[in-house]
Amino acid sequence: MSQFYCREDELRKLNKRYAGDKFECIVIYGRRRVGKTALINEFCEDKPTIFFSALNTTGKENLEALSKSIMSFERPDMESAPEFRSYDAALDELTALSKEKRIVFVIDEYPYLAKAKPAISAMLQHIIDHKWTESKMYLILCGSSMSFMESQVLGKESPLYGRRTGQFKIEPLDYKETAVFHPNLSAEDNSLIYGITGGVPHYINKLDVRDSVDEALLDNFFDRSSYLYEEPGNLLKQELREPAIYNAIIKAIAEGASRMNDIKMKVGEENSVVSKYLKTLIDLGIAKKETPITEKPGKKTIYLLADNFFRFWYRFVPINMSAIDSGRIAKIYPHAVKQYLPDYMGLIFEKMCQDYLLYYSDSLPIELSEIGQWWGTDPKKKKQTQIDIVGTPVEGKDYIIGSCKYRNEKIGVDELDLIRDYASVFGKGNNYYYYIFSKGGFTDGLLQAQERGEVRLITLEDLYK
């Protein structure tokens, strides 16, 4: 299936701006493989387009590539295109082309161009202000380095600040959008595909699940010749200078280290070093910082892997590397991988349940402001309490408290008693609405509690309805 799938809303908005026939500067950004270029290609398919994909090389070589892109648009039959003497000359040619005719000019991988030619943002600012605002130019700046795009293109310090007319941060698909790729598979299989690929269309296609997730993993993931097996290493080499330390940090977090001190101990580096590398991983969208909902960042801050694909790879590949290399992984897969999938899916199921409440539930007892996890110390029992879901209200003091269980056994009334206790430890609400999500269903006793209006029960299958 096309990587463009589920991007209809973005395409509609891009086309609406194109129909206006006035200058546009659109910024499109998001992590690698998420489908940015596929979206742009779909948008440009029936439009006059100059598509320039910047190279991770010198300014001179990028000017040569830009010259070819412009000349192949102007004179598609010309075998060898002349090179513009300067970037100013190339931009002037684009100005001339867009005076009377609507033209889409795409700079893909814009951070590469800005690195090779640091003055390019100021040059674009000048030509936008003095020439392009009165033209029919439709400029698209696209990039995968999210920190660069947010600070050096969208940020207040950027020469381009205030010049954009629209921006799109292209996110991975959510769990329900991911399932559209495999409408005939079960809810369990689709949840696993989401947990493995993180909703990245390119990875969904490469995993290529047909009848069995297990079979697809063995053929297209746990195989040395497969694309997905090599992908994390290739991405890190492409983005980072010292992948070894980044590897160690990602592996530490994937194995359960979430606090700075725990990560530092596993990696064997000082806090200052780990902190610097973690910041880069956060900028790339691989890791993320989390704080208990309703609280400010501080001592309770933890680090998690934001990218499910990296999380899955680092959870299961390094520990099974010998079996993969020797071709024995199929023999040990049931007890080396499959039996741990429910545990691996725990955090992912929580995110699915949060997204269900935010985007897909038809009727909620409160209007949600935000949703997330909460953790803190129970002062009576002197131990940590963690609540899978806390939904905060737009106004008032009514909260949603939820529990998420990705396991095969039925959940009973004791889980409702437990989250009631958790709500009292949380202690910020006057009233609480309880939700329990379960892959394996519920006991008769808990179903009766739902009939009495004490709790709302939602199965994995319900998430996909």
Segment roles from a protein language model:
Residues M1-A330, P334:
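Phosphate-binding site recognition
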Residues I293, I302-K465:
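A cross-kingdom feature that marks ATP-driven nucleic-acid transaction machinery
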